[in-house]
Amino acid sequence: MADSAVRVRIAPSPTGEPHVGTAYIALFNYLFAKKHGGKFILRIEDTDATRSTPEFEKKVLDALKWCGLEWSEGPDIGGPYGPYRQSDRKDIYKPYVEKIVANGHGFRCFCTPERLEQMREAQRAAGKPPKYDGLCLSLSAEEVTSRVDAGEPHVVRMKIPTEGSCKFRDGVYGDVEIPWEAVDMQVLLKADGMPTYHMANVVDDHLMKITHVARGEEWLASVPKHILIYQYLGLEPPVFMHLSLMRNADKSKLSKRKNPTSISYYTALGYLPEALMNFLGLFFIQIAEGEELLTMEELAEKFDPENLSKAGAIFDIQKLDWLNARWIREKLSEEEFAARVLAWAMDNERLKEGLKLSQTRISKLGELPDLAAFLFKSDLGLQPAAFAGVKASPEEMLKILNTVQPDLEKILEWNKDSIETELRASAERMGKKLKAVVAPLFVACSGSQRSLPLFDSMELLGRSVVRQRLKVAAQVVASMAGSGK
């Protein structure tokens, strides 16, 4: 395939805060397109109507733009193969699904959610992986027509071969073989008429002329489904490349519970986008020690997709901090540094809102750093002494911290009102007054017992920062409990 024909895409789902993993995959695709003189396309995959929101879509676009990733086609700029938002393409998919059914490769399934859940529970109890048991495969054409005409809710599933295996070549993993018995009869079209990710993904990649699909290794097991859909439609699949997942230092999967994973966390704390891209780009190149500081153009020059490792890319925040420091000191002139600081401050909602809250709580401007500096620190340096004024034992504080952490994860819209509501409910469940519950949280989030209002502060810090600070506080308090302090 000629380099000029290369077309790659990043296809995030707008269902939450933009993740550094999205930036990682997007950067690979961007560099791949640059290397081959191809096109980098942005597509919004919002088939999950219950979780996708315009607000999250805007955050995704803003985050990728902040990273310095420029796309040739997308929902904001259009292009020859739009629309670039799956919810705007709903009518495009159904004919492809109907073709699969008409050719005998798909079937209508009338199983209720309750019946499917009972099926899965029985399979789990028997020690089997849950997957569809094929009940509706045996329905006659007459019965299917009758139930469809009666308006009975149903989905469309794909048929899977009953024996043998799917063999394919992956750009990273090489030759892969997955037995068909491990592949589920995937839903292609949901009862509401929206396609599932798998169906929309294949159709969109075909219509948008995507030549290479580079995504996380978690999608490797889905390739047999996608190859089957291509075959059922008589289409040529793209080249697949499945990238190793980013991992924590202990080799566990990068998780928001262990490290801040939202791009907004790094923007708010003043990391440079060039440094973050530099850090992520090092996973895709081979360099000698001392050559780590690279611009986007230099990353593109050194980019080599032929030598990707299957080992997990370690997300080492200390290395990111080191790179960010070097970018600030070595890559920015004094004028550029001043301009970056001013731009960061002027565009920083956390700073603006923090100043509003501080105005009625200080008598001199010089008091501001002590009162609001916690909003911008990546590490509070929390020590046991910070909890000295809390009227609770270390064991009681630890119980509070460990209880509220999962409770806060339940919040759908992160704002001070929902935070207060959830913490009041937590206090009630623990049989404690709200004041007793928020006392250790106050220290955990701000590092001090004198600071800005807790609920406002938690909203400004954001979910990922609060999660990280509560985790650190629990570790500090646990050490106090263990030492008898």
UniProtKB/Swiss-Prot annotation:
Residue positions of motif 'HIGH' region: 12-22
Keyword Transport: no
Protein name as it appears in the record: Glutamate--tRNA ligase
Gene responsible for this protein: gltX
Catalytic activity: tRNA(Glu) + L-glutamate + ATP = L-glutamyl-tRNA(Glu) + AMP + diphosphate
Statement: the UniProt record of this protein carries the keyword Calcium: no
GO cellular component: cytosol
Chief subcellular location: cytoplasm
Motif extent ('KMSKS' region): 253-257
Family the entry assigns: Belongs to the class-I aminoacyl-tRNA synthetase family. Glutamate--tRNA ligase type 1 subfamily.
Function: Catalyzes the attachment of glutamate to tRNA(Glu) in a two-step reaction: glutamate is first activated by ATP to form Glu-AMP and then transferred to the acceptor end of tRNA(Glu).
PROSITE patterns associated with the record: AA_TRNA_LIGASE_I (PS00178)
Alphabetized GO MF terms: ATP binding; glutamate-tRNA ligase activity; tRNA binding; zinc ion binding
Residue sites binding ATP per the record: K256
UniProt organism field: Rhizobium meliloti (strain 1021) (Ensifer meliloti)
Subcellular location(s) of the protein: Cytoplasm
Known EC number: 6.1.1.17
One of the protein's GO biological processes: glutamyl-tRNA aminoacylation
Pfam families, per database record: Anticodon_2 (PF19269), tRNA-synt_1c (PF00749)
Keywords, in A-Z order: Aminoacyl-tRNA synthetase, ATP-binding, Cytoplasm, Ligase, Nucleotide-binding, Protein biosynthesis
Enzyme class: ligase
Top-level lineage group: Bacteria
Quaternary structure, from the entry: Monomer.
